[in-house]
Regions:
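S-adenosyl-L-methionine
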Residues: 1-39, 47-56
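SAM cofactor-binding core of SAM-dependent methyltransferases
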Residues: 36-95
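A short acidic, Gly/Pro-enriched loop at the edge of an enzyme's catalytic core
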Residues: 99-108
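Class I S-adenosylmethionine-dependent transferase superfamily signal
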Residues: 109, 136-137, 146, 159
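Conserved class I S-adenosyl-L-methionine
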Residues: 122, 149-165
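A short glycine-rich, Lys/Arg-flanked "PGG" loop and its adjoining helix->strand segment in the class I
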Residues: 128-142
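Conserved beta-strand signature within the Rossmann-like core of class I S-adenosyl-L-methionine
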Residues: 142-150
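Class I S-adenosyl-L-methionine
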Residues: 159-209
Length: 209
């Protein structure tokens, strides 16, 4: 972490950061109001999450990321814009979902470009597994959306099979199909680089009925 990123923690964590407690969290209290909550897991450098919170003030945004420099960058960006609808956690996302997020509490969950763990022997480390998807589905409100995106075709195939097999979720594109990129996901720097290298991108948008 750079000195500037450490200063961001020191200056802005009290305003935007939520420390993991391992007990049910009142999201309305955390944000100071009652509004739909969008969760982004693994927000990287925070570029997308910052833009989403800035451009969509009617909803609240919670980001979870374990990478310190990315958290520091997002804290600086949020403070520079004076955002009030953004909160950040630096902890394992599965533990946060399991221990702190109530059933039906989320309007949307976004997992964009998670680590594909491309070697076969590492596939078990992939975040998107049946137990994870079932947990996320239980935290979505009726009509809530789970949106995944990846630029790794093998992982996309795996994701599609796992999501389509979850009885609590419906594929908005139809069973066995990928979704068009929805308007709320703008292109990331990582994605632009991938496209220049000829990589495809696959979006999956499933809704809890």
């Amino acid at each position: 972490m750079t000195p500037a990123q450490q200063r961001a923690f020191d200056a802005h964590w009290a305003r935007y950061g939520l420390d993991y407690a391992g007990t049910p969290r009142d999201l309305a209290q955390a944000f100071g109001r009652s509004a739909p909550v969008v969760l982004e897991i693994g927000f990287g450098n925070g570029e997308q999450l910052h833009a989403a919170a800035r451009d969509d003030p009617a909803r609240d945004y919670l980001g979870i990321e374990v990478h310190g420099p990315g958290v520091g960058r997002l804290l600086n960006a949020a403070a520079a814009d004076g955002l009030s609808n953004l909160r950040v956690m630096r902890h394992d996302a599965v533990e946060v979902l399991r221990e702190e997020i109530a059933a039906g509490a989320l309007a949307q969950v976004r997992v964009w470009f998670p680590d594909p763990w491309h070697k076969t022997r590492h596939h078990k480390r992939r975040l998107v597994q049946p137990a994870f998807v079932a947990l996320v589905a239980s935290r979505l409100a009726p009509g809530g959306v789970l949106h995944l995106a990846t630029d790794w075709q093998d992982y996309a195939t795996h994701m599609l099979a796992v999501l389509d097999a979850c009885p609590a979720l419906r594929n908005t594109a139809g069973a066995g199909r990928y979704a068009p990129c929805p308007p709320w996901r703008s292109e990331t720097r990582f994605e632009r680089r991938g496209r220049r290298l000829g990589h495809g991108v696959w979006d999956l948008v499933h809704v809890r009925d």
